[in-house]
Amino acid sequence: MAPEKLMHVEQDHQIVLARLEKYLRLGQQCALAVQDPCVLHAFKVEKLGWLARGLAEEHRLMLSRLARAGEAGGCAELVCAWLDGEGGVVGRYGALLVGCADLLFESGMVRYQMRPRSEFLICVLQLYTKLEVLCGALAHDGLAQQLQNFEEAFVARWNRKNMSLLLFDEVVDVLAVDAPFVSPPLFSLDNVVKRDFFELTLPKFGYTQLLVEVFQLDTGEIAIFRVNSERLPYRADQGKRLLRQITSCGEPLTCIGRSLLFSTFRKSDLTVLEEMPSAMHLTTRIDSDVHMVLRAVYQFEWDTFWRCTLHTMFSASPPSLGGIAAIASARRISHPPQNFKIKHQKLAETLCCGTQGLGLQLQPSRPTTHERQLQDAGSDCSMQTSLLPPAPKLLSHAWTAVPEESGEDSQSSSGYDNTPQQLQLFELEDSTSTRGSQNDSSLRLLELADSKRTDSGSLVLQYPSFRSSIASSLHLRSPSPHSEDTASEGSARKRPQPDNGTRNAEHDDFEESFASHKPENMKRRNAYLLQFLNHMRPAS
C-alpha cells in the first residue's frame, strides 16, 4: 500500500475512534440509581471509552511516525510491527469490538440498543469497515482473526435477538368468519416446548409459502409466528454478509423478530383433510374456505415430532404412526377449559337415563393418631378424677415459713406451737410400677391449709418427732413389694371408718377437716400418703 493511502487510513481510524470515544463518554454522564441493573453496563461503557481513547492516541502517534518514515518507505512493515508490538493493539481492538456487540444486544439501554439510525451502531460499523480495509491492505493474520471473532459474536447475538423477540400487534382470529383482529394470548418463551420452521400456504389471506415458525406451547396449543426477515437464521460463517447488509441498507434492522399471525389453536380447532409428504392440509370447522397447508422445512423434525403432534391435535381418528410418538405435552389435552369440557362429555355418556348431576360417596372420617391419643388421655383423666377427690393446684416452688408472732393471736391463728420448721415441697413423680396392672400417674401433694391458715403462705408441722418418719416415707422411686404391702395393711387397720349417723348436730355446717374429708385408699400405693396425712392432723 502506498504511504499516502496508508496515512489516509490512519487518519480515518483516528476520527472514528475519537467519535466513538466521545459518544461513550457522553453516555457516562447519565445518572443511574444504585439498584438499576444498567449500572453493571455503565462500568463496561467506561472501560470501552478508555479503550477507544487509548487506541485513538496510538493512531495519532503512529500517524506522526508514518509522516517521518514516508520518504524512506517501509510504511506497511512499520504498521505491522506496531500492531504486533508490546502495546497489544490487536488485542485491544478485539476487546473493543466484542464489548460494543454486547452493548448493542444485551445492555437494554436505549442509548446503545440495536435500532435503525442508531449513532452508536453507525460508529461500530464504521470502525469495523476501517479495520477490514486495513486488514486487507496489510494481510495481517492477527487482525483478521479479531475481525472473524467479532463477526461470529455479532451473528450469534443477532440470531438470538431475532428468535427471542415476539410481537403480538396483528393477531387474527382465523376461526371466525370475518377474521377480525383480536387480543393476543399471553405467553412467553418460557412456555414454548418445541419450535421449528414451516412454509405456510393460506390463499384466503394471500400467503404462499410464507416462512413461519410453529410453536408447541406447554399447554398443548399450537402457535404460528411469521418470520419477519423471511429467511432462516444466519450461519456462523455469514457474519460478514450480515454486517454488509446492515451497513449498506439497514433493512434487517426493520424486520427483526417474530409476529403472531393467528390465535393459538387448541385441540380439535382444525381438521386434517389430507396428509402430504412433509406437510399437512388443514381446514376449520366453521369456514370451509380456509385451507391451510403447513410444510416442514426439516424432514427429520417432521418425522420425529410434528407429524404425530398434528394428528393428535386435529385428527378425529389418528392413524398408526409407526412407533414414533410425540412428547407428553403433545399427547395431553390442549387447554384446561377444553380438558374440563371433554371430561364432562365422557362423564355424561356414562350416566343412566334420567340421571342428572354427579353421584358422590362420602366415607366417614377416621380419627387420626393424635385425636385417638387425646381421647385416651381424656378417658384416663376422667377415671382418675372419679377415684380421688379434686385437689387444688400445687405450687412447685418452696414456701417460706411465716415469721413467728407473739401473743395469743398468733397461737390462735396458727393452731401450732411456737417452733415452726420450714418445709420445702417438691413435685413428686411416680415411677413405673413393677406390676403391669398398677401403672399409676404421678402423685400430687395436697395443699394443707384450712380457713384459719389461708394467709400464712407456709406449711408448718406440729409434730417434729414424726419428721424423720415422714422423710423416710417419701422415697418413692423403688419401694419393695413387702414394705408396700405391710404399710398398706397397717394403714387399713389404723384408719377408722367414718360413720355419718354419729355426727354431732352442733357441726351441721360444712367444715373441711381430715376426719370427715379423708381420701379413700382406692389404690394400694397411696398408703404412704394417708400415713403422711394422718401424722399432720392437729391434736384434737
Swiss-Prot record:
Region feature (Disordered): 473-523
Skewed-composition ranges (Basic and acidic residues): 514-523
Source organism superkingdom: Eukaryota
Family according to the record: Belongs to the UPF0508 family.
Name by which UniProt lists this protein: UPF0508 protein AEL141W
